[in-house]
Every structure is written in structure tokens, then in C-alpha cells.
Amino acid sequence: MVHLTHVPRPPLAQFVNLLWLYEGYTQQHAKERVLPTGEMQIVINLQEDRSWIYDREDTDRCQSFRGALVSGAHSQYQVISTAEQASIIGVHFRPGGAFPFLRMPAGELRDVSVSLDALWGRGAGELRDRLLEAESHQTRFEILERVLLDELARGCGRHAAAGFALRQFMAAPHMTTIASVSEQIGLSPKRFIQVFRDETGFTPKVFCRIRRFQQALERMEGRKSVQWAQVALDCGYFDQAHFIHDFRAFSGINPSTYLVHQTLHRNHVPLVG
């Protein structure tokens, strides 16, 4: 299996965490959960011009998209097929970083995925064609980076308040309050929530819950046993029961089940339970 990443240069780096590519991705399990991170991605299937997201309640049902799709601001896990990930390339945005590339408020992509051509028109298909014609993986990264730079140049500017709030929430998601942030930036709580939702896809409260969930996953990564009460305390949960409730809300499984079935990819878990 080939797994490559590419960190873009400024000014793209402040919006995009990294570009990634998989070739020959195979797993024993047929489907897996993709857990919410508070971030958006562009995913381009290079194997065929089609992508699928499966229904959480009935995994025999699915939504079909063109080969290039935008995975929006998800607060619940998604179900994907591992067989369809054999040759893919993607863009992993920073929290709020996708906004200038969407041509719409990020809140309109809350808990949905859409074909990239719904946002970029025929440019999405042209991008996929260019990636398929590229002679090397590095060339693919360079093509993707140039297209993103072009989109950034024509995209909407970001509100300074959203960037400030994201820095506060990323540093201490369990300690920073909406009231304290809105007071510091000079916006009413209602206006602040709207600005934050437009740029990240989430309300501040939901975003902070997802970040706490991600902090918990970091503490669980690679471990065979965990003191759940300590994880709950370290991540700012009121108690262990609140931690387990949030974990199930975002992942659909208990923390103990996740621990047994975790993979090398923290946010990808075999579909069980």
C-alpha cells in the first residue's frame, strides 16, 4: 500500500492541513466508520468516477456521488466501503479552512456530503481528469495545490472573529465559553454563533464537543486498556457517563468497543456493533 502526504506552502497552509493519497488500500473488513473531526475534506476517487456514502442504519443503502466529493461538517460518523478506497487523493482542511473554497456558507454542508461539481462546476471533473493523467504522485499533489490556490484567490475572505474563536476552542475546548469569546471579539453571542457556523459548519458548542471527542481518541490511541474516568477528567467531561454519552453520539459505539477495534487510522474503525 502507498500512503503519501504533502504539506502545502503558504498561503494555502493556513487553510489546508495536508494533501493525502492512498494506492492499494485494502482491509479485511468491508465497511468502516469515519469519525467526525470538526474538519472538512475533498476526496477524489481515482479508481472510478463514483463515490458512495452508506446509510448508518441500513448499510445496504447508499448515496452515490461523482468521483470527486466534499465531505462536509459532520457531527456523526459516516460509513464507507474499503473496497472503494483503492486509489484516492484528498484535501484535509484545517477547522474552518474549507470556507473560502466552498462558494457557500459551510453551515449548508452540515452533516452532508456533496459532489464537488455542485460547488466548482465542470472544474471538478477537469481536476480529476488532470490527476488521472499525471505521471507521478508528486505531480498529482502539485496539480491539486495549484487548483486550490486558484480557488483561494477567487474565494470569500474569512471573518477575523472565526479565526480567533477557533484558536481559543482548539487550545481549550472544555474551558472556553461562547460568552467569553463573543465579548473579546465585540460581537453579540447570536452574531458570533452565526459567523462561526458560516465558516466552520458547526455551532461553537458542537465544535467544542467534537474537539473533546478527538482529544479522547488521542488518549486512547494504540492502548489496550484505559482508565475511562481519567480520560473523562482530562478531556473536560463532567463525569464518565457524559463522556460515554458523547462518544456514542459521535461514533455510534462505546469507548470499550472502539478500543478493541481501533486501527492505525484513529478516525477509521471497522463497522461493528
Q: What are the functions of these language-model segments?
A:
Residues M1-P189, E199-T203, E218-G222, Q227-F238, ...:
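Alpha-helical bundle regulatory/interaction domains
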Residues F196, C208, D246-R248, L259:
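DNA major-groove recognition helix of helix-turn-helix
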